[in-house]
Amino acid sequence: MRWWRARPGTFRFLVRAAVLMAAFYSVLYYSYGDASLPARVLVRYLGFLARVSGGVVALFDSSVRVDGVFILGRRPLRIVLDCAALDALALFAATVLAFPASARVKLIGFAAGGAISWGFNVMRIGLLYVAGVKWPRLFDVLHEDVMALSLVLVSVGCFAVWAALSRGNSARLAADASSGA
């Protein structure tokens, strides 16, 4: 244990985050049976994401309706696990949990960053629908490259902002405590 504490804080953070990411990805991408509880929860989540995203798209295209994990309209979309942003949320959660901050600060950070990432993903799905209708030749590159990277960058950005704010908050609390305030 002394060896671990002697390592630089950045090293400890990176190792913790990597271990948590491996654990989260293992749970997320494990090959569950269709009737298992995790598989049923994931399918319900994908259906919920399809309903919310379809509702946003329906604001601009009245032909849109949702059936399970399908957004149907002028450019049908099927919401699958890779569309769910759970991998980006897992990255965000792993880094927040690995970061040296109080449980309360981590919970606030996860709630705020998770909501931002989730909202961005809903917007991403809506934009992909529009791109599929208006610019079908761009759809694949937007879907597989641009928007996928954007989602990861939003999660990383949320972490960076949260880490800076939580670090500043910790420094301010430490200064207040040492000054007797």
Task: Show where each model-derived region lies.
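Hydrophobic N-terminal alpha-helices or hydrophobic patches in metabolic proteins across all domains
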Residues: 1-181
